[in-house]
């Protein structure tokens, strides 16, 4: 959904829950405004007003419910938005994964095993604070540029891409 309204985003999530099977791999990318009010995190769609309480913001708790309904074997959500990353339910702490874990001879076996398990991962540009906007001359945020750089690196690797590895490699780049 490009420049999605609240209705468009809800429809896209509903469609994903109907169309996906346990054999699917799904990537969701949200780039837009986010806000925290009353300790709740929100996505602000293109038709969202600046005023909280107008009913046109999307609570992250609602997104979590939509994600639960998507039947995909692996689901990754990349969020390039202020304030919302820490509010996703069951979010992993990436700091516990070190680069040495990735370079070990056991990493391939770890990935093989991980691919057999159903997964839900969220990688966000911000947790509870403001994140940077577009990098001059690129048309992309620092987060998006970091993702694109990592995709180029992983394209040349012999092992599959996983969100946890990507997060470790991106840490500190945006």
Model-derived segments and spans:
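Short beta->alpha junction loops
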Residues: 1-7
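Caspase-like (clan CD) cysteine peptidase catalytic core
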Residues: 7-31, 35-92, 158-167
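Active-site-proximal C-terminal subdomain of hydrolase catalytic domains
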Residues: 72-174
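Residue-level detector of conserved, well-ordered beta-strand and adjacent loop positions
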Residues: 2, 44, 124
């Amino acid at each position: 959904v490009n420049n999605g309204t609240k209705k468009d985003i809800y429809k896209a999530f509903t469609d994903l829950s109907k169309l996906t099977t346990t054999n699917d791999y799904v990537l969701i990318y949200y780039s837009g405004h986010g806000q925290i009010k009353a300790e709740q995190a929100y996505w602000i769609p293109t038709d969202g007003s600046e005023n909280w309480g107008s009913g046109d913001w999307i609570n992250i708790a609602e997104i979590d419910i939509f994600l639960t309904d998507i039947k995909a074997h692996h689901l990754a959500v990349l969020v390039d938005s202020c304030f919302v990353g820490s509010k996703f339910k069951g979010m992993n702490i990436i700091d516990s994964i070190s680069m040495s874990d990735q370079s070990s001879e056991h990493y391939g076996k770890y990935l093989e095993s991980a691919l057999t398990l159903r997964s839900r991962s969220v990688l966000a540009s911000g947790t509870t604070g403001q994140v940077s906007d577009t990098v001059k001359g690129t048309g992309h945020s620092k987060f998006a540029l970091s993702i694109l750089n990592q995709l180029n690196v992983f394209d040349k690797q012999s092992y599959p891409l996983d969100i946890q590895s990507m997060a470790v490699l991106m840490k500190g780049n945006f």
